A protein has these predicted regions:
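Canonical Rossmann dinucleotide-binding motif of NAD(H)/NADP(H)-dependent dehydrogenases/reductases
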Residues: 3-36
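A glycine-rich helix->loop->beta "capping" turn
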Residues: 4-6, 62-65, 85-98, 104-107, ...
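The beta1-alpha1 cofactor-binding region of Rossmann-like NAD(H)/NADP(H)-dependent oxidoreductases
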Residues: 49, 53, 70-81, 113
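Substrate-binding pocket helix/loop in short-chain dehydrogenase/reductase
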Residues: 59, 107-108, 115-120
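Active-site helix of classical SDR
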Residues: 131, 167
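Residue(s) in the substrate-gating loop at a strand-loop-helix junction
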Residues: 151
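C-terminal helical subdomain
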Residues: 191, 209-296
Length: 297
């Protein structure tokens, strides 16, 4: 089976370099018309460049179709204008990859709240702005594919990245809820947690390992997650050719005869026992497990 994007219109944010560029190039190579969005900022969000135009030129040189957009994902009106321009030019918007992001890493004790809010605003609020801009069109089409970019930091935590972790965890939760809301409209929403050497992460990898973590090795998983046959609600880790699935699990837990702090302490090992754990598909399903325990199941 060959995955094709002929006839599809895709928007990729943060596509002036790194992962976004890799996604945009591969989508265009496989037939999609691509909006390459990038503010052209440095990894902390400062400055501007013509990074988006450079990627559009690469796509055009390879025979593809693309347009550049330099709007900030933090500007809801600019993102709506971008989506409207794509729809006017190409007849719709079928794919959105929310990839734009910044880093302002510090331990929480040393972090200014302005830096906490700035990272949340780009990653989480920016993704919400872009998704809101295309959601109505996707509903009308009866078709949409949206990919959120989370991180191992958002799923598992990482020292010195409280702002980034909060944003990335929020994106995973947003994607799960939108997967439920979009299902009846043919909209599928997934999350990718990439491991790649980009301008945002290159300092984390030893120089001799950078080649193993090329952004191009994350792109296959990302493109599958926005393809016709994509699942919905999945959280997929990808990097260096390794693809994994992440799940939020729930233990069977314990019904306490007397719910007191002391009882929780005494039973904590049993509460935390992962034998027989489950993966609820919705928040409501998690609540039902409590009811089932009350009923003795």
């Amino acid at each position: 089976m060959t995955i094709s994007f002929e006839g599809r219109v895709a928007i990729v944010t943060g596509a002036g370099g790194g992962l976004g560029r890799a996604y945009a190039l591969e989508l265009a190579k496989r037939g999609a018309k691509v909006v390459v969005n990038d503010l052209g900022a440095s990894r902390d969000g400062s400055g501007h460049s013509d990074a988006a135009a450079a990627v559009v030129a690469e796509i055009a040189a390879a025979g593809g179709t693309a347009m550049a957009d330099g709007g900030s994902v933090t500007d809801a009106a600019a993102m709506q204008a971008m989506a409207d321009r794509a729809k006017a030019a190409w007849g719709g918007v079928h794919i959105l990859i929310n990839n734009a992001g910044i880093l302002r890493d510090k331990s929480f004790a040393k972090m200014e709240l302005a830096d906490f809010r700035a990272v949340i605003d780009v990653h989480l609020n920016g993704a919400a702005n872009c998704t809101k801009a295309v959601w109505g069109t996707m509903q009308e089409q009866g078709y949409g594919r949206i990919l959120m970019t989370s991180s191992s930091t958002g799923l598992y935590g990482n020292f010195g990245q409280a702002n980034y972790a909060a944003a990335k965890a929020g994106l995973a939760g947003l994607a799960r809820t939108l997967a439920l809301e979009g299902a009846r409209h043919g909209i599928r929403v997934n999350t990718i947690a990439p491991t790649a050497a980009t301008r945002m992460t290159e300092e984390l990898f030893p120089p001799d390992m950078l080649g193993l973590f090329r952004p191009e090795l994350v792109a296959p998983a990302a493109l599958f997650l926005v393809s016709d046959d994509a699942p919905t609600g999945a959280i997929i880790g990808a990097g260096a050719g390794v693809v994994q699935a992440a799940h939020v699990t729930l233990t069977r837990g314990v019904r306490l005869a007397e719910p007191t702090p002391e009882a929780v302490a005494a039973q904590f090992a049993a509460i935390d026992d992962r034998a027989g754990e489950i993966v609820p598909q919705t928040g409501a399903e998690q609540a039902m497990t409590t009811l089932q325990r009350l009923q003795g199941n």
